Amino acid sequence: LRHLCNLRSSFFFFFFSVPPVFDDSYYGFVIHEIREMTVMNMGNYAHGNQPIQHMIYLYNYAKQPWKAQYWLRQVMNKMYTPTPDGYCGDEDNGQTSAWYVFTALGFYPVCPGSNEYVVGAPLFKKATIHLENGKDVTIEAPLNSEENLYIKEMKLNGKSYTHNYFSHEDLMNGAKIQIEMSNLPNENRGIAAEDAPYSFSVDEK
């Protein structure tokens, strides 16, 4: 991802090209995956086609994690509803529902071959994961609401935490994740180079 951003000259220009995913301008004609997404005002983001389900999390790689937080909530609210048309696309061996479970908790394994889970934003005010080793992962976001969908501040085990990822070890050792949610994006959090999740490529000199 880092090299892809570099090929686009800068992080800004890389993500200047990404927002059109959320409109219907790309193809110029109707295809079935896009028809249902357009109806939901999601444009070309075909969530029912599993290979795209990591895409929103990529904002975390380019210093704009608040955009991931916004769009992830939009997908959960619009595409997972208890109505006849409330579940987009197909399941593909549990991937679409697994995406929701991870995303509702506030993180997702974008690159399963790494040891990292990329941060989104939780859907609940509190959730607890009881691990097989007897330890717990607790995610607390008491101000969470339909309006308060952005991460203002986050702590991991009592310490301020700005990274846009958790390591597998962080979670498996038991973790307490405390998140202060806000109705405004914090554009100063998670923007340092060391806050970006794993990338196979690194900056080239």
Question: Can you name each region flagged by the protein language model?
Answer:
Residues 66, 81, 111-114, 118-205:
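Beta-rich accessory regions
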Residues 1, 8-138, 143, 169:
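Active-site core of glycosidic bond-cleaving carbohydrate-active enzymes
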